[in-house]
């Protein structure tokens, strides 16, 4: 065999060895990947809740238009330009439970309940919209507003009195804890006058 033929044979053998090595490496890697453990899935980080939304500011007063609770005046203030001015005057006096305001004559009537032991006057606060989380009842302890009754109920709990108040579309009720007497109340209709109950909120 000539030297050239021997060289060709050697080259062919080398190529076969390289091809064989590549094929062997391919199958080795394939088998290794098939047997490799599956990496665990990283846990999903839960979304952290944001800070709680601050509640809507509750109103300090609840107003009923075209209504009056006559009498019970503790102070009459003239020349108050706006209802807000009247609200501020009521807020200055801890005994002021509600007020009537006459916007035409700019007169503010600050009101207080009649001191009566074991009797609570509770104003109904009809909140709507953004104020649905605010208080719906504003009690005035040991105080009464005689008159304005639309229904009287005996031998009831105060919770039952409250439900009767809602049923009869009341504006407030008086409840005597000794006699268990419940008096459902409503303002008088009076055009041009507003009645505004103090809710107990500080806004």
Swiss-Prot record:
Keywords: Disulfide bond, Glycoprotein, Repeat, Signal
Keyword Nucleotide-binding belongs to the record: no
Superkingdom classification of source: Viruses
Signal peptide feature range: 1-24
Family annotation (SUPFAM superfamilies): Hairpin loop containing domain-like
Residue ranges occupied by any PAN domain in the UniProt entry: 58-128, 134-203
UniProt xrefs under InterPro entries: Pan_app
Record-annotated disulphide pairs: 86-108, 90-96, 161-182
Glycosylation sites: 73, 95, 118, 155
Matches recorded under Pfam families: PAN_1 (PF00024)
Protein name (database record): Putative PAN domain-containing protein L775
Organism: Acanthamoeba polyphaga mimivirus
């Amino acid at each position: 065999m000539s030297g050239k033929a021997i060289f060709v044979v050697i080259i062919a053998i080398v190529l076969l060895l390289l091809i064989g090595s590549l094929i062997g490496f391919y199958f080795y890697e394939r088998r290794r990947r098939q047997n490799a453990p599956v990496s665990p899935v990283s846990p999903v980080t839960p979304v952290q809740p944001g800070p709680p939304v601050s509640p809507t500011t509750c109103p300090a007063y609840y107003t009923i238009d075209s209504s009056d609770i006559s009498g019970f005046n503790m102070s009459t203030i003239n020349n108050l330009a706006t209802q807000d001015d009247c609200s501020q005057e009521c807020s200055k006096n801890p005994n002021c439970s509600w007020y009537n305001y006459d916007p035409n004559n700019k007169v503010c009537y600050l009101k207080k309940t009649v001191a009566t032991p074991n009797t609570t006057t509770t104003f109904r606060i009809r909140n709507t919209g953004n104020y649905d989380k605010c208080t719906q009842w504003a009690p005035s302890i040991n105080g009464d507003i005689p008159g304005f009754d639309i229904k009287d109920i005996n031998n009831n709990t105060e919770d039952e009195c409250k439900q009767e108040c809602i049923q009869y579309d009341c504006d407030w009720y008086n409840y005597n804890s000794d006699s268990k007497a419940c008096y459902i109340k409503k303002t008088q209709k009076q055009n041009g006058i507003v009645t505004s109950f103090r809710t107990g909120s500080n806004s």
